[in-house]
Amino acid sequence: MTIFLVGYMGSGKSTLGKKLAYNLKHDFIDLDSYIQEQEGRTIKEIFEDDGEDYFRKLERVYLHRIIDTENVVVSTGGGTPCHFDNMEQMNEYGLTVYINMHPKALIPRLQLSEEFRPLIAGMEGEVLLDYVYKTLREREGFYHKAHKVVTGYNLSAKKLHEFCLED
């Protein structure tokens, strides 16, 4: 089984994905980390050097390289489902799970990792909250195309595992 975790940055896709993969005895791929390994530079550097449009094209290329891998849990970038036909492709090749979180719950998580997230670099307080509300509203239509939607509040890998196996 291939499972694609989608959702806003900071929703727990990577943290839960690693644990879920372990529980399922699957491999784990963090798409952003995979891109960084393949490109030899950070996401932040790619954004700074080449811009978001270039990054989204790279993201699509690398997603398609791994999309038909079996027995893997893939943590996607927050914007991955929103570009090209990425969401449709993930839906075709595996189980997609949207980890849904309210913007106010995302803020503390994002503030802890802001330096690694180029889209929110330098944002704080109301500016960050407004940005999260706005972009989450824009992305939710894509996220809700997932096969399953689960709330990320107090979500454990065990609960996510059980949820993925439910019909």
Indicate where each model-derived feature is located:
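Hydrophobic anchor at the beta1->P-loop junction of P-loop NTPases
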Residues: 5
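NTP-dependent small-molecule kinase module
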Residues: 23, 137-167
